[in-house]
């Protein structure tokens, strides 16, 4: 097992990793920018190191500063959390070059899944169903129109190096294709430094379903059920739940088995999530995230497995915590991402939290690093915290969520709490009858 882990992140995920380390008896090092000097994970860690000014590129993305922090403190492993350097294959390789353990997958798998075109080819080879589309990048010399006609309009133009909804454009008709290609390519170039794009069939009203996996890197891999992340705004997840209200037991078992088998063949190491669009009973691979996800608590609540703790244990050479047969999905869980944003315009609302009360009771969990008097800095994402609830049934879970949302107090800044209080009372949400465009259509109706 590792002796000391440096947590190369901030906010709630840094605190989440710190908790797992403490339960394993591992010493912790928090790193922070000057803007995060008063952060909760900095207060609770055994040691802390300031790694630079507020801007992420000068602090949390500053690899030399992180290496120096490891050397100063004697850390033997680095946990990257999510975001920042968590899916940076070069960072994993640099750590290995310095005899440091990267708590995550092998660098080759991070690189493979980071290239969306190669990821899709690999998924197809491993027997994972994929969205019909171009076999690779579509360049100026390719017959984009011919490919699009073969797929069938509408088509989606996507950045090969994309993520977070950037570099994605829909061409509803042949007339839209040229503009969609140039716009997506330009966006991709400015956001990711890579202008290459590819084409996929555009599904009209799909759900977004992802499968959580855990691999030991030696050919052992299991799946821990699915999460439904269909409630999204601008391709950003807002609400996640598991099991998915859209799936039946047979579909769940079939896709889970397919994915686990693929991860065994890949010899995947650690936690990972395979994301799918789901429409008319069919799954279509979108991408694989080779890190812990923001919404991992949903799976923890319904499987009773500590994913971050197991991620650390497996990175240190440990075995899988259970066989596939021992994994039992218990009850239902929902997570709401509460952001420091105006609930109507979604403008960021950084500032000082004057009052803070976290809801409690059976089956209620808050993953947050904020406290009364804490100042949310304007430099990073606007997550205040994640409210996660569990119930024996989805109906019980919704009632518990409604109660917890009404109980939660965050004053001094604007938050998206009012949005969730409204959503949890919406008939479509109560019925579990929603798709990835539902929330944006709902919001458009509210402001009309």
Regions found by a protein language model. Give the residues of each.
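Alpha-helix initiation/capping motif
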Residues: 59, 84, 112, 137, ...
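Acidic/histidine-enriched active-site and ligand-binding environments that engage anionic O-linkages
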Residues: 147-156
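ATP-binding N-terminal substructure of ATP-dependent carboxylate-amine bond-forming enzymes
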Residues: 1-126, 138-146, 179, 396
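Conserved beta3 strand of the protein kinase N-lobe
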Residues: 133-134
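ATP-dependent carboxylate activation and anion-phosphoryl transfer catalytic cores
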Residues: 6-26, 48, 71-73, 89, ...
């Amino acid at each position: 097992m590792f002796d000391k882990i440096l947590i190369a992140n901030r906010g709630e995920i840094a605190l989440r990793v710190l908790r797992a380390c403490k339960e394993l008896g591992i010493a912790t090092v928090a790193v922070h920018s000057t803007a995060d000097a008063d952060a909760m994970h900095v207060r609770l860690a055994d040691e802390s190191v300031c790694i630079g000014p507020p801007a992420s590129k000068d602090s949390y993305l500053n690899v030399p500063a992180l290496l120096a922090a490891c050397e100063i403190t004697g850390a033997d492993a680095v946990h990257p959390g999510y975001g920042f350097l968590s899916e940076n294959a070069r960072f994993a390789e640099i750590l290995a070059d310095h005899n440091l353990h990267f708590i995550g997958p092998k660098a080759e798998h991070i690189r493979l899944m980071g290239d969306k075109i190669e990821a899709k080819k690999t998924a197809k080879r491993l027997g994972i169903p994929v969205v019909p589309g171009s076999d690779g990048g579509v360049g100026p010399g390719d017959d984009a129109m011919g490919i699009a006609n073969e797929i069938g309009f509408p088509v989606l133009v996507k950045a090969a190096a994309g993520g977070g909804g950037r570099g994605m454009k829909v061409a509803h008709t042949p007339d839209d294709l040229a503009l969609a290609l140039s716009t997506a390519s330009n966006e991709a170039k400015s956001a990711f430094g890579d202008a290459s794009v590819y084409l996929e069939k555009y599904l009209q009203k799909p759900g977004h379903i992802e499968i959580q996996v855990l691999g030991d890197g030696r050919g052992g891999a299991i799946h821990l059920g699915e999460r439904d992340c269909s409630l999204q705004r601008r391709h950003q997840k807002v609400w996640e739940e598991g099991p998915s209200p859209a799936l039946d037991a047979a579909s769940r078992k079939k896709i889970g088995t397919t994915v686990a088998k693929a991860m065994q063949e890949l010899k995947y190491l650690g936690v990972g999530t395979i994301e799918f669009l789901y429409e008319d009973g069919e799954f279509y691979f979108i991408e694989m995230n080779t890190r812990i996800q923001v919404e991992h608590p949903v799976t923890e609540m319904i499987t009773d497995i500590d994913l971050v703790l197991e991620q650390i244990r497996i990175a240190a050479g440990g075995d899988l915590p259970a066989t596939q047969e021992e994994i039992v999905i218990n009850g239902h869980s929902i997570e709401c991402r509460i952001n420091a944003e105006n609930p109507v315009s979604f403008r960021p609302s950084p500032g000082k939290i004057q009052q803070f009360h976290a809801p409690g009771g059976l089956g209620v969990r808050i993953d947050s690093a904020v406290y009364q008097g804490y100042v949310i800095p304007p430099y990073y994402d606007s997550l205040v915290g994640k409210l996660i609830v569990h119930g024996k049934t989805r109906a019980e879970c919704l009632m518990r969520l409604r109660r917890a949302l009404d109980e939660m107090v965050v004053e001094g800044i604007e938050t998206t709490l009012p949005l969730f209080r409204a959503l949890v009372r919406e008939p479509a949400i109560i019925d579990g009858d929603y798709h990835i465009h539902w929330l944006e259509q709902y919001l458009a109706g509210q402001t009309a």
